[in-house]
Amino acid sequence: MTDRQTIALVLGTRPEIIKLAPVLRELESRDHPYTLVHTGQHYSGNLNSVFFDQLNLKSPDYDLGVGSSSHGEQTGTMIREVEVALNEIDPAWVLVQGDTNSVLAGAIVTSKMDAKLGHIEAGLRSYDRTMPEEINRILTDHASDHLFAPTESAAANLATEGITDRVTVTGNTVVDAVDQHSDLAASESTVFDRFDLSPEKYLVLTAHRAENVDAKERFQSIVKGVSRAADSVGFPVIYPIHPRAEERLSEFDLSIPENIRLVEPLDYLDFLHLQQHAATMVTDSGGVQEESCILETPCVTVRASTERPETVTVGANELVGVDPAEIVAAVKAAVETDADWKNPFGDGTAAEQILDIVCGNHVVDNTHVNR
């Protein structure tokens, strides 16, 4: 049995690694005991282990290797394996970040044991129940002993669901991550040379969500719209393609126009540098919406809803769906946008604020305030 001050962190995907990196560094700086549990939800090397190495983070203490499968099978396997790991660790707190199946598994297991559950990036809502992540967010928020909301808007979402007494608005750890890594990315990234790019003279596409890439017509529409947009502004497109999307391109026999360049998934520093200097991002990723806003890079989101409405409110992001004409119009407008919006995601001290609460309340009682 380990020290009852131990904090366990359960994660499983690239965005979780990036957003929890500031928390891990803050734990190291405080010399506070912690254990890292990686479910293996992301199973490609470039989407997983390379991030720990490049960001100088310690390797996970537990690597569960769950991999990809249906939502139910994957989550069920995670619950079983995470329970074994957490029973061995016997932590005082378990921290999860975001809205993945790894987060839900960590939340369910922790809710059944003598440990506190903290949800980082709590309160996000798209109000679209067709998104698997929306269910994960809601269930995890309602199971948590403390909720670390990134914005006042997220806290207001929780209040409408009756959660008010255990919420702290900390800002988003993605701001901490961008602040900590931007200079390093500038000094180490070679993407401009590798791809023969000039700053602010290219577009970046990221499309990986099931509702977009698993539907041939939607995927084809996105590709067509982005290609036409690139022609209209005279810029090439870099598309770091997710394994899921690459499989669908082959399965659907979709051709990629010459002005869209497919590249392998990039490491975090390369992608951050590419994102920081893009003329516009076109994405279906929630994390890219946030990072683009922080980096002052205009964003066009090929979705009908977003759990990051702050990006739209401040003028950093436009939701357009997948209609090619709307994508073209939005990209043309975005390229001309003055990035003079205010970052709505905090001041870069989220990790410190989170651990001030968690490390200051490490003694566990036998009750959970909300269960």
Give names to the regions the model predicted:
Residues 239:
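Conserved proline-anchored active-site loop of SAM-dependent methyltransferases
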Residues 1-235, 245-371:
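Nucleotide-activated sugar donor-binding and catalytic core shared by glycosyltransferases
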